């Protein structure tokens, strides 16, 4: 089904169904059935945007707004909604909603050039935000590193909106041929040698890329893993790479993994490091070798797809130091989207916790990572020693669930229950952009009893607030063993080998 048509039907369905039920519960967070105990002012983005859409749809002064976000090679994404006509007394309401929508699109889909049709006021306001001294200067500069272009806002007529051009990157779960799968993490690197779907070799090697400024350390480490795999293969037909960081056209544009490398060395040796290492294999075997480099979140979703063995869409979110995301379509394809869910606004509460790096509020990282646990724990009155690392603060809260002290145990249970409420109201928001039937939840935040409480509360919220979505989406927590073993093997399935 055409994506634009799907969204129109989706919004219409929700709008009509609310009136059939005689309920206004979806037209604003004031009527939410569930509120986080330690964050009662939480305003889910999905409900707030839906309330805006509903209010506008009842106005005689409504008009259609079309947003097109373009990235490299002309790939783009279209978003259509209703807004109030310019100058009808609702310009601030328009701006607040559309400013949030644009921020969401930047971090979900990715891109640098906005085409906006349907308003003259909004492009001008947004242009003020996305400049070197504007409110969104962080995004303005960040996306220059990602797409090698600053964020640009173009006002245009509807007929001037570029034609929809979606990217489809096929991924294979059959693993035919002789393949290398490589997974680059912050504390170890994993490699697998796979022949026609059978894993012949897997090795996990400790490394510390975040602490080394010499590009040769990283190059040597990658080649060491490649060469280990080659010893167990007669030839190499394809290489798939899973890496932390932002990947565009197989290049690693921004990555904390290589954060110590100088800007000059990064540009010369790191941005194309994986492609350059595969070129060395091509010289070794005197042949062209297909290669696909993907964000580790997308590969996590692919690993889930292989484990579930179903032709259905999968969204994966990893909850650790931050939040990571990955998506595989029901046709087993990557989309080329950014999927940086850590910086996607999911709470429209104007007093939501501020992220000091991006200078924005209400972003996913503060709701689905160890930072969320710490935030809620402090609000609940939990005391932490000053020298505790964030990871150890998380561990302290997780240990409280096992405590014999009933008060401590209840506080910890409420923290993970509150996070489950966050997720229950955010899944419909994710469904607005991603077509998925399975949500994989990973990471140390959801290990142990806390993770079970988190998932069960999210399911409860879905069932009672969004029953149609509850029927469609299943939530899974893969076990640690299958996740660790599967990541590099799944990466091996990235390139299409013919």
Give the predicted meaning of each segment.
Residues 25-79, 93, 125, 165-172, ...:
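Glycine/GP-enriched mid-protein hinge/lid loop-to-helix segment characteristic of carbohydrate kinases
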Residues 113-115, 177-183, 236-240, 292, ...:
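Short glycine-aspartate micro-motif
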Residues 100, 216-232, 277, 422, ...:
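Short, well-ordered amphipathic alpha-helical segments that serve as non-catalytic structural scaffolds
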Residues 1-24:
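Classical Sec-dependent N-terminal signal peptides that target proteins to the secretory pathway
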Residues 25-161:
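Long, compositionally biased, glycine/small-hydrophobic-enriched stretches that function as flexible linkers
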Residues 418-436, 494:
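Phosphate/ATP-binding catalytic cores across multiple sugar-kinase/actin-like superfamilies
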Residues 108-120, 235-244, 434-445:
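Short glycine-rich phosphate-binding loop at a beta-alpha junction
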Residues 87-98, 105-109, 120-157, 206-220, ...:
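Glycine-rich phosphate-binding loop and adjoining helix at the ATP-binding site
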């Amino acid at each position: 089904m055409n994506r634009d048509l799907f969204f129109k039907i989706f919004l219409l369905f929700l709008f009509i169904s609310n009136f059939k039920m005689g309920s206004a519960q979806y037209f604003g967070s004031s009527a939410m059935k569930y509120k986080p105990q330690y964050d009662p002012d939480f305003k889910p983005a999905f409900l707030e945007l839906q309330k805006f859409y509903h209010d506008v749809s009842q106005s005689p002064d409504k008009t259609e707004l079309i947003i097109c976000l373009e990235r490299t090679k002309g790939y783009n994404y279209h978003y259509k909604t209703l807004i109030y006509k310019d100058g009808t007394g609702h310009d601030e309401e328009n701006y607040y909603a559309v400013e949030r929508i644009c921020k969401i699109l930047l971090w979900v889909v990715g891109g640098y050039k906005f085409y906006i049709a349907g308003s003259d006021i909004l492009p001008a306001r947004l242009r003020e935000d996305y400049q070197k001294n504007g409110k969104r200067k962080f995004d303005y500069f960040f996306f220059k590193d990602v797409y090698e272009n600053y964020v640009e806002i173009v006002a245009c007529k509807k007929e001037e909106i570029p034609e929809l051009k979606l990217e489809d990157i096929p991924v294979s779960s059959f693993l035919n041929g002789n393949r290398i799968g490589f997974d680059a993490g912050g504390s170890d690197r994993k490699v697998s040698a796979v022949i026609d779907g059978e894993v012949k070799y897997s090795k996990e090697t400790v490394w510390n890329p975040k602490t080394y400024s010499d590009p040769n350390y990283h190059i040597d480490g990658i080649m060491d893993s490649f060469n280990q795999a080659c010893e167990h293969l007669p030839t190499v037909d394809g290489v798939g790479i899973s890496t932390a960081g932002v990947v565009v056209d197989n290049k690693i544009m921004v990555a904390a993994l290589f954060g110590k490398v100088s800007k000059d060395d990064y540009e010369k040796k790191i941005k194309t490091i994986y492609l350059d290492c595969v070129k060395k294999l091509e010289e070794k075997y005197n042949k062209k070798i297909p290669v696909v480099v993907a964000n580790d979140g997308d590969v996590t979703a692919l690993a889930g797809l292989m484990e579930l063995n179903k032709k259905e869409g999968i969204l994966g979110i990893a909850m650790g130091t931050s939040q990571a995301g990955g998506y595989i379509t029901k046709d087993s394809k990557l989309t080329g989207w950014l999927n940086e869910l850590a910086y996607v606004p999911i709470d429209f509460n104007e007093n939501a916790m501020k992220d000091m790096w991006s200078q924005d509020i209400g972003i996913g990282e503060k709701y689905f990572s160890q930072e969320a646990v710490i935030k809620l724990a402090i609000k609940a009155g939990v005391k932490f020693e000053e020298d505790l690392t964030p990871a150890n603060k998380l561990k302290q809260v997780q240990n409280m669930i096992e405590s014999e002290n009933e008060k401590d145990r209840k506080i910890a249970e409420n923290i993970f229950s509150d996070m489950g409420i966050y997720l229950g109201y955010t899944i419909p928001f994710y469904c607005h952009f991603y077509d998925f039937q399975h949500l994989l939840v990973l990471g140390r935040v959801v290990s142990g009893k806390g993770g079970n409480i988190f998932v069960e509360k999210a399911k409860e919220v879905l069932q009672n607030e969004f029953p149609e979505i509850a029927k469609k989406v299943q939530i899974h927590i893969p076990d640690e063993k299958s996740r660790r073993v599967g990541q590099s093997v799944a990466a091996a399935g990235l390139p299409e080998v013919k």
